[in-house]
Amino acid sequence: MFHNMSKIPSYWNKAKKYLSKKDKTMSSLIKKYNSPSETVLTSRKDVFYSLCKSIIGQQISVAAANAVFLKFKKKCKNKINAKTVIKLSTIQLKSCGLSRQKVKGIKNLAQQVLSKEFKPRIITKMSDEDAIIYLSQLRQIGRWSAEMILLFTYNRPNIWPIQDIGLLRAISKNYNKKYLPPESYVSYLNK
């Protein structure tokens, strides 16, 4: 499994140049938010950790997700891996603030990793769409979560999460739309 290697994606500088040439709005945003904000792109190369964090953060505020995740991390004694999680009881996991469904999702993930039913290493050999489908077969992981894992854990360069509310709001704000843009407009920007 991937572990704690953090780095800015290798394609990042090339991508910034490409986007700057292609789109005036993107060019000004890239200039505006250039370093040190790029450190936001560094990622934790631990798929199990990232999937647990994704499950925990679903449908709650960022602040609540961070609080629950800190309790979860403490319960795991800072060792968030399948072997540690599988040993925790449902009651222990719920005491972190996890719902019954999230507990099931995290326990199921741990079981699938330990049984090798889920093999994170093969994702590196898959196309983006195949990887999204593969990740989406996990309990509590839908398309958006799979896209976020590919983008921030695997640092895939061509992920364009058209259902992401943050992306939609940013497009609306920066392209002077008075509404959240339709999927067709978001897809057009990706070309």
Regions found by a protein language model. Name each.
Residues 1-43:
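Intrinsically disordered, low-complexity, charged terminal extensions of DNA damage-control enzymes
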Residues 25, 35, 57, 61-65, ...:
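Short helix-loop boundary/capping segments at the starts of domains
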Residues 46, 51-59, 87:
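Long, charge-rich intrinsically disordered scaffolds of nucleic-acid metabolism proteins
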Residues 12, 23-26, 65, 164, ...:
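Alpha-helix initiation and N-capping motif
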Residues 73-191:
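Catalytic cores of DNA base-excision repair glycosylases
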Residues 53-65, 93-102:
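A short secondary-structure junction motif
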